[in-house]
Amino acid sequence: MTEFPKNYNFTENEKKWQQIWQAQQIYAYDPNISKEETYVVDTPPPTVSGQLHIGHVYSYTQTDFIVRFQRMIGKNIFYPMGFDDNGLPTERLVEKQKQIKAYNMGRDEFIKICEEVVESEEEKFRRLFNQIALSVDWSLEYQTISPLSRKISQMSFLDLVKKGKIYRNDQPILWDPVDGTALAQADIEDKAKTSFMNYIIFKTEQGESLTIATTRPELLPACIAVFYHPDDKRYKHLACKSAITPLFNEKVPLLASPLVQQDKGTGLVMCCTFGDQTDITWWKTHNLPLKTIITKKGTINFPHNIAIDGLKIKEARIKIIDILKEQKLITKQEEITQTVKCAERSGAPLEILTVPQWFVKTISHKEALLKRANELNWRPNNMKIRLENWINAISWDWCISRQRYFGVPFPVWYSKRVGEEGKILYADISQLPVDPLKDLPIGYSKEEVEPDLDVMDTWATSSVSPQLSTHCISDNFAVNKDRHNKLFPMDLRPQAHEIIRTWAFYTILKAHLHQNTLPWGNIMVSGWCLAEDRSKMSKSKGNVLVPEKLLEQYGSDVIRYWSANSKLGADTAYSEDVMKNGKRLVNKLWNACKFIFIHCNKLKDVDKKASLFDIKEQITNEFDQWMINKLVELVNAATNELQNYEYANAMHLTEKFFWVIFCDNYLEISKTRSYDEENKNPQGQYSSILTLYHVMQILLKLFAPFIPHITEELYQILYSENSIHVKGNWVNYGDLHYGIDVTQSEGLIAILDIVRKFKAENNLSIKAPIKLLEVSGIELSAELTEDLKNVTSAEEIQFEGQGDKIKVNVIF
């Protein structure tokens, strides 16, 4: 190029380079390269469940920093993109977008609408991810609802069935009455809600009054026992007696249990099927009867009492309380704040129903999973405790059944054949993927089977996201075993911290159960993107940032710069100031390269193409040599930080070096020598230009993982027609060093700082001429003295001996 472009138009250039990178397949994975030379990423498949937001940009770019670095140090990169486009989150999006309800229409019709919405939403993701320059190989893309993914997911199910790690049982489960489906423990969240503690009068068979405190009087028809603590002296006399429930006059046993909290309420607790997990424990332990009064729709089913039959739960609670008050069976009510288990998606309070479901054995593997958590490299390490706390808190096996439509079906039927009614029939591996509503088990007719109508929890499929890319579950359930062996276990799982208890946990569980291994060696956990006031972004607050607007205003590189300024794992507020700093950096890089472009035609082509090792002897000036030493220190430090996934530290070191050491000091100090207008020092000029040229080349490479467009543009203008982002284009000058006295160059900078401060305090131009500089505390070499005279505009410099502290007297 004979002329440096006048301006940098980020809109045009970013789009240009994105198209070129795709066309040249810069980011393509090579399946012929060994596992040892390959870096494999288990990319988070974004949930197709709503609007794109700045949080997507924030977390995905942080992964891309590491991936680009690994590619540049020579790794073959397997970096796919997937879409988690099945399950309840997607169904809720479709219902909201189309103003429909799944249960009000045919299953096939609803699934077809889901597929149409998913296709449109995924295209938005692709467009955004290309705009922010994620260096994924799009040929590796997968969808969790695709035929291949359904096959892999069903393989996972059958493999765990074969291994005895999955079972079906009619047992109490968490139920969301709004979405009409069973949920797993990880799908719930605790919410603080205001309620009332109602003190209700029961009687013993002998007529003794007992007061029981409860927040759920609507469950009185399902009361099966009353419990007290065995050490509670108030109630020891109740042993072997029975109580009579108010209103319904049912006789229930009075039983002792250490699970009762003596200081809560009255110390007497009614056990119902089911109010909470303690009720389940008592029901199982004491072999109590089952009374089910709550329906899947969250209404009361109790035809014996028409006053509450058919009412919604809250309505039934109010009605029961009114009747109890009428009959003077409530002694008092206390307003309380209690923790209620709610569905994470719908927000509805959960019920506990007894429904046949599929479960993955989890509780029995808690100790093994804690060991797995410790084997994993956590980035940052303090995130490990979140998984450990979750594993310790697990009290339910993983329920993977969902009573929805748009998901991966269970490859299961139930026999109606005479003599084997209810027998579970599993699909053969050759049939996968199967839809039991349309397909049949081998050897059975349609009339002989009942299909399983449920679909799998979306986490049951996304928990095998590594295997969705490797196309294999285990030795016995594989589509491509060779591909799997080359890619699994993977190197990196990047994800957000709020899904450690779901995606991270379930993926670790599945890999442990399938192949007795970890799914990856490293987990990189990102924080949240917060609003500028550090509050959580939400539509209700109106503070959600739309990426498209920011991209239009600032461009991809500036947004990536903002993301790179956030330490891994930390919650970070969006900042206009940081965005502006990113814009300044892009402009400064452009202008610095423009200056170098002016001079680089003075260099020999062979020296331009050479490495620093090859041209070491041609960098003759002491200050230039100091600059190269500092550059090598930077390269080593930034490389070390990126190898440890500390991208923010690497970015900070590089940026500080560029602004302070390179631009503010080196470039200004060497500028006169670079021009050498009077041809006084041709050797010094060549040394300076050579240093400028190669230092900037390396700085562009260090910046490349973070701001890929501007670095590519400048790299192509100054250095090469090949992409800066190609495999193996990092730098390594670990043992390159000039044996110079560093105090000399650092002394030069210290003197310059003093002079600059003096001129600023006296409102003088930085170029204002100085008659004499009197310097004490150091004596610079002739070379450095000449550079100092040039940069300070000093006619003469006098050194007045060595000392502990540098002092400068400026004389005009």
From Swiss-Prot:
Pfam families, from UniProt? Anticodon_1 (PF08264), tRNA-synt_1 (PF00133)
Answer whether the UniProt record assigns the keyword 4Fe-4S to this protein: no
Q: Which UniProt keywords apply?
A: Aminoacyl-tRNA synthetase, ATP-binding, Cytoplasm, Ligase, Nucleotide-binding, Protein biosynthesis
Task: Give me the reactions it catalyses.
Answer: tRNA(Val) + L-valine + ATP = L-valyl-tRNA(Val) + AMP + diphosphate
- What GO molecular functions are on record for this protein? aminoacyl-tRNA deacylase activity; ATP binding; valine-tRNA ligase activity
Cell compartment(s), UniProt: Cytoplasm
Alphabetically, which GO biological process terms does the record hold? valyl-tRNA aminoacylation
**Domain of life of the organism encoding this protein:** Bacteria
Motif location ('HIGH' region)? Answer: 46-56
Q: What is known of its domains?
A: ValRS has two distinct active sites: one for aminoacylation and one for editing. The misactivated threonine is translocated from the active site to the editing site.
Q: How does it assemble?
A: Monomer.
Q: Kindly give the HAMAP family that the UniProt entry links to this protein.
A: Val_tRNA_synth_type2
Q: What's the name of the protein?
A: Valine--tRNA ligase
